[in-house]
Amino acid sequence: MKVTVIGSHLCPDTLYALNRLSEVKAEIEFKNLSASLPDLKAYLALRDSDPHYEAVKQSGGIGIPAFVLEDGAVTLDLGDVLK
């Protein structure tokens, strides 16, 4: 399984997700929004255009960690990735 994780090394939920994905031997590409302005800019474009984020934005959340699956699907649910 290959997955891109979009998050921050400062976010406990992101760290938990990275650990769980490592446990199942997933191939992880980590986009650390706290360390890369280009990754942050790309994430904000995704967040502004993807309907998955409407509830997150309305509640004032950031929406991380986010996961981009091999087929390009985006989910905010680690359970979807681990299936």
Identify the meaning behind each predicted range.
Residues 1-33:
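Local sequence-structure signature of Cys/Sec-based thiol-disulfide redox active-site neighborhoods
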Residues 15-16, 40, 77-79:
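Short glycine-/acidic-enriched loop or helix-start segments at secondary-structure transitions
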Residues 18-21, 45, 81-82:
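Short, glycine/charged-enriched secondary-structure capping and boundary segments
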Residues 28-50:
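Thiol-based oxidoreductase modules, predominantly thioredoxin-like and allied folds used
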Residues 52-54:
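Major-groove DNA-recognition helix of helix-turn-helix-type DNA-binding domains
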Residues 56-63:
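Thiol/disulfide oxidoreductase modules built on the thioredoxin-like
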Residues 63-74:
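A short, hydrophobic beta-strand/beta-hairpin element that forms part of a small beta-sheet core
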Residues 72-83:
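C-terminal cap of thioredoxin/glutaredoxin-like
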